[in-house]
């Protein structure tokens, strides 16, 4: 195929394979990657502001590791995409809760203690991920590795996700002034 057929496909005049590849495969995947990247960026910046630490992110705090372990277990159980995503969300929330509980200790928690607890938990989750990959049947390992690297092969038009990103950004912009004050710390 040449560029002329791609342009015709973009104009909606072509119902060939080129059109199907662009509008049914490539465009939904690109849109999904854009939305997921936007959501991850928003989550990261909000974590950094709320915890008043530029090192805070889902990986350092162990949230991503908890999501990965839960998702890999869901893949092992043969769950489909929605179940895997749901398991990852539950794993992320459970890991975040565990970080907050463990970092509190006997008194109040500090951001330093929270980050150090997250680093320890992230290392533990990394070991669990390695163990799951090592003992998993060969038939599942490829799918697990692709999922861990950010697989978007099974995607569908993400209008709901795009709407969620837009609403989340609008809410964050609504709190922008307060978040800026919070990021300055104590004056």
Describe every region a protein language model picked out:
Residues 1-187:
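Alpha-helical transmembrane segments in inner-membrane proteins
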């Amino acid at each position: 195929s040449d560029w002329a057929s791609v342009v015709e496909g973009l104009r909606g005049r072509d119902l060939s394979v080129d059109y199907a590849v662009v509008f049914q495969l490539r465009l939904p995947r690109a849109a999904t990657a854009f939305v997921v990247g936007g959501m991850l960026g928003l989550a990261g910046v909000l974590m950094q502001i709320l915890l008043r630490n530029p090192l805070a992110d889902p990986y350092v705090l162990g949230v991503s590791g908890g999501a990965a372990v839960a998702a890999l277990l869901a893949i092992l159980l043969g769950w489909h995409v929605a179940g895997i995503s749901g398991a990852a969300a539950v794993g992320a929330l459970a890991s975040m809760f565990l970080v907050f509980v463990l970092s509190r200790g006997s008194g109040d928690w500090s951001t330093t203690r929270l980050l150090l607890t997250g680093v320890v938990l992230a290392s533990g989750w990394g070991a669990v991920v390695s163990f799951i990959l090592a003992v998993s049947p060969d038939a599942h390992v490829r799918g697990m590795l692709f999922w861990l690297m950010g697989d978007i092969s099974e995607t569908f038009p993400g209008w709901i996700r795009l709407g969620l990103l837009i609403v989340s950004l609008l809410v964050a912009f609504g709190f922008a002034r307060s978040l800026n004050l919070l990021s300055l710390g104590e004056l």
